[in-house]
Design a protein with these regions (language model features):
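Core transmembrane alpha-helical segments of multi-pass membrane transporters/permeases
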Residues: 1-16, 38, 42-43, 47
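Alpha-helical transmembrane segments of multi-pass membrane proteins
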Residues: 31-45, 70-91, 114-115, 121
Length: 157
C-alpha cells in the first residue's frame, strides 16, 4: 500500500485561484468575471450533487474574491452566487439529489405510475427560467452594479 506524504499536497488559497482565473484576458472585466463566477458555482454545485449550501460555502469565498477584483458590488456577487447555485444545475437528472429524492417519493402508490428522473427534472421550470434570466443579466449587463468608495452601488465603474 502506498503511503502519501500529506505535506506534499498544497491547498490553493482563494487568492491563488482568483489569480489563475485572471491570467486569461476574457475574465478581466465585469462580464468576464460574472461568467467565471457562473461557471464556478455551477460546476461546484454539480460536484456536490445539487446541495447548494455546501457548494456556496465552498465556492463563495472564491466568487467573492473574483468579484472584488473587478469591483462588483457585494449584492451583485451574492445574488449571482445564490441564483446560479439554485438554477439549472438543480434539475440535472443524472446528478441532483433533489431529483432522485423526488422520484423515489412517487414510488409505491397503486393509483399512479412513479415518475422518472427526467419527468421530475423537466418540470422544475423555476430553476430553468432563473438560469435564463441570470444569464441574460450577465451577458447584457442588466442590473450590474459596482462598489463605490464607501460601499455605495454605482451603475458604472
Amino acid at each position: 500500500m502506498k503511503k502519501y506524504d500529506v505535506q506534499k499536497f498544497e491547498l490553493l488559497s482563494n487568492e491563488q485561484i482568483a489569480d489563475g482565473i485572471f491570467e486569461k484576458p476574457p475574465w478581466k472585466d465585469g462580464r468576464g468575471a460574472e461568467i467565471a463566477m457562473m461557471l464556478g458555482i455551477s460546476l461546484t454545485t454539480l460536484i456536490f450533487g445539487g446541495v447548494t449550501s455546501a457548494s456556496m460555502a465552498t465556492f463563495g469565498k472564491i466568487q467573492n474574491e473574483i468579484g472584488k477584483r473587478v469591483g462588483l458590488h457585494p449584492y451583485r456577487r451574492a445574488n449571482l452566487l445564490d441564483g446560479f447555485a439554485n438554477a439549472i444545475v438543480l434539475v440535472m437528472p443524472f446528478l441532483s439529489v433533489f431529483v432522485f429524492i423526488g422520484t423515489s417519493l412517487t414510488e409505491g402508490y397503486d393509483m399512479a405510475e412513479p415518475l422518472t428522473v427526467t419527468q421530475v427534472g423537466g418540470s422544475m421550470f423555476y430553476s430553468m427560467m432563473l438560469f435564463l434570466v441570470l444569464l441574460f443579466s450577465v451577458v447584457t449587463g442588466w442590473g450590474r452594479q459596482y462598489e463605490g468608495e464607501n460601499g455605495e452601488p454605482l451603475n458604472r465603474k
